[in-house]
Amino acid sequence: MIAGKSVLAFVMAGGEGSRLHPLTAERSKPSVPFNGRHRIVDFVLSNLVNSEIYSIYLLVQYKSQSLIEHTRRAWVMSPLLPHHFVTVVPPQMQHGPEWFQGTADSVYQNLHLVELVKPDLVVVFGADHVYRMDLRQMIEFHIATQADATVAALPVPLEHTSSFGIIRTDSAGRIRDFREKPESAEPMPGRPGHALASMGNYVFSADLLVDALRRAHSRGGHDFGKNLLPAMAERNRVMAYDFTTNRMRGIRDYEEPAYWRDVGTIDAYYDANFDTLGEFPKFCMSNPHWPIYANPDQTEAAQVHDGHIRTASLGAGVVIRRAVIERSLLRREVVVEEGAEVVDSIIMDRSVIGKGARVRRAIIDQYNFVPPGMKIGYDPEADRQRFHISESGVVVVGKGQLKP
């Protein structure tokens, strides 16, 4: 209960994540590893649980097995508390032989779960962002403003508006116009060069959400941003919640205020990982007041057998043998052999960097064996023939692409 209201959460975790390919070749975007031992989905789930929202349905679709397995291992709630659960929900085809047709349709196809739980409020959040947020503050705002729906929002540069739902509000914060990914947008009053963007996170009064979903479905509308919210903004009281006002305990002075990243591209994903690195990171993964939970790891501690290490994150079970590691993140059970160099790179679980190999500005997905002496990130033309290269030049080696 929050402010006397019962709350049910739907997490939309069915995204295909095509712009994150090849990291999403065998997994969905929310299941992509992040930092030392997390998955992207862990951020929204941690925000919900830390906000005392314990009734959570995780809506999955594309390449969901990795996400299902992670949820089963990392997000087990007490069976003694019936309203404490993180339950994975694949498409049930309740209304015919169709997968989820859009974000709103994923919730529409599961309205029976709303009727089962009978909450006062329903929160609908995405699963592919890196941030901390106390949802209780947004819910209290929703109640205080007597909103039918509330959209979490923050300013974005005008050149990025085509990637977001763009909001226009009146002086009281009520949404008067909602356009999904427009080619251009007007600047915010008092913020030249910026527009107010939806974060894809919503709070709804339950009865009104059910009614709005049924209306949208009857008109062939399947998406929150394209269909449901623009229609609700015309009929109902829909408010914008300013994410920058969300207060979080434990944030250090050097961290970026109201940190939030959409990690939907390789470059955005790469940059967000490195935002967590260093003595004064923009986003510190460690905050005892608001932990980001992860799969409990029983692996042995990392081992370093000589070498040069500077500004690095080493996961459990990492072994480094007389190697050079600079400004890099190494996840569980990575092995870096003698004479190898890893610089400005992300090396994922159980990959091996062979003797004398050199890796620079790259993402090496799980279960790869970089052969002795191989160079990755030093010759763009040679790398492009074998691997994926992002717009900014980050080399991505797909899961298990390099075999022993």
Swiss-Prot record:
It comes from the Bacteria. It comes from Aromatoleum aromaticum (strain DSM 19018 / LMG 30748 / EbN1). PANTHER family: GLUCOSE-1-PHOSPHATE ADENYLYLTRANSFERASE (PTHR43523:SF2), GLUCOSE-1-PHOSPHATE ADENYLYLTRANSFERASE-RELATED (PTHR43523). Belongs to the bacterial/plant glucose-1-phosphate adenylyltransferase family. Disulfide bonds: none annotated. Alpha-D-glucose 1-phosphate binds at residues 165, 180-181, 198. The gene is glgC. One of its GO terms (molecular function) is ATP binding. Its EC number is 2.7.7.27. GO terms for biological process: glycogen biosynthetic process. Pfam families: Hexapep_GlmU, NTP_transferase. Involved in the biosynthesis of ADP-glucose, a building block required for the elongation reactions to produce glycogen. Catalyzes the reaction between ATP and alpha-D-glucose 1-phosphate (G1P) to produce pyrophosphate and ADP-Glc. The keyword Transferase applies. Coiled coil: none annotated. Keywords: ATP-binding, Carbohydrate metabolism, Glycogen biosynthesis, Glycogen metabolism, Nucleotide-binding, Nucleotidyltransferase, Transferase. SUPFAM superfamilies: Nucleotide-diphospho-sugar transferases, Trimeric LpxA-like enzymes. It catalyses: alpha-D-glucose 1-phosphate + ATP + H(+) = ADP-alpha-D-glucose + diphosphate. Homotetramer. Pathway: Glycan biosynthesis; glycogen biosynthesis. This is Glucose-1-phosphate adenylyltransferase.
